[in-house]
Amino acid sequence: YNDGKITYVLVDEMCQVLREFMEVMKTYRVQDYRAYASSALREARNSQIVLDQILVRTGVRVIPINNSELRFMTYKAVASKDAEFQKTVQTGTAIVDVGFGSSQISLFDKDTLVSTQNLILGVLRLSEMAAHWKVNYHMIPEVIDELVDNELYTFKKMYLKDRQIKNLIATGESIIYMVKKGMKEANRDRFTAEQFKAFCKKLTSMSVDEIEDYYEIEHDYAALLIPGAIIYKKVLDMLGAESVWIPGIRLCDGIAAEYAEESRLIKFHHDFEGDILSSARNMAKRYKCYAAHTQEVERTAVALFNATRKYHGLSNRERLLLQIAAILHACGKFVSITKSTENAYQIIMATEIIGLSHLEREIVANVVRYNIQEFAYDGVILESDFSRHG
């Protein structure tokens, strides 16, 4: 994260691991797979070279995905624990997914996603920042504390406000290690806020060597548990939640849930499309869109889409994108009424909408951009790589 590129040594190591993994897949006669790249590869300057090297040297086709897609997968994996999930999100609930490059906080109320926000608070990113600044080991928790406080203050003022959060659902790689090996009640997945805070406080007071021995993990990974514990504790303090549920979900579970749904192996009872629309409506509310007008535009757009379905042949996914465009078509007026469509384009492109790929966000942004002006067929330049959507 500090250098902005992946070294050839790491590329060699990745290729070696992937080659060995491919051999394991052959042993089990695996017929299909999914390989995704998250923030480390997505943000690297040499990402395309690395992806090409992996494909040539291992035969593995890696698909880079944006943060909103990645978090949506994890969210689906949590929702796959159907009964517990539905019961938990009936009251004010937050899902906190702490990753290596960033963290995601999603707020629920009465079974509906209210808002979701990505924060640049990843355990590896924070650890590398502390190392780059040559921070004294004993000062690392204090420095990370300050970085986390700064990000959470903005989130609290903009998104949390007076919302009451009763439950916290904690997901991510680090929380699994922290709980499975660090808490005496390892056979449980629910804890009171006080129990969880006490555990996090104990972990942050340990040295990396002590964590390495106690958790029986490698030294490099042991160093990542400290920022993880700080993030979870700080978020819990900010939310004021009473209980913590740790379902043991990580990104791999999310990938499996996504694949199972696409292959029609499982069917979710939760309305994920409703969550995406709810997120868009809350975004429109934040930018002071006129609700009555927006609702009428959305209703008319959907009616026209449905009435002309036999002519355009588009799917329900395209209808969802049209709905989002209708909901957000006036958000640019928050910045300037005279150039509202151009401003709306910039706002949508700068905002992650959970569950949408970068290409889908570009489609929505361009539909809004050319809402009241002539469509420039030769003027639209998309950033997305179409090869992964073919």
Task: Give names to the regions the model predicted.
Residues 32-33:
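Post-signal peptide N-terminal segment of secreted/secretory-pathway proteins
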Residues 92-96:
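Two-metal-ion RNase H-like nuclease active-site motif
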Residues 2-28, 40-45, 50, 56-90, ...:
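Helical "lid/coupling" subdomains associated with nucleotide-phosphate turnover
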Residues 99-102:
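Active-site-adjacent helix-turn-beta-strand microarchitecture at beta-sheet edges
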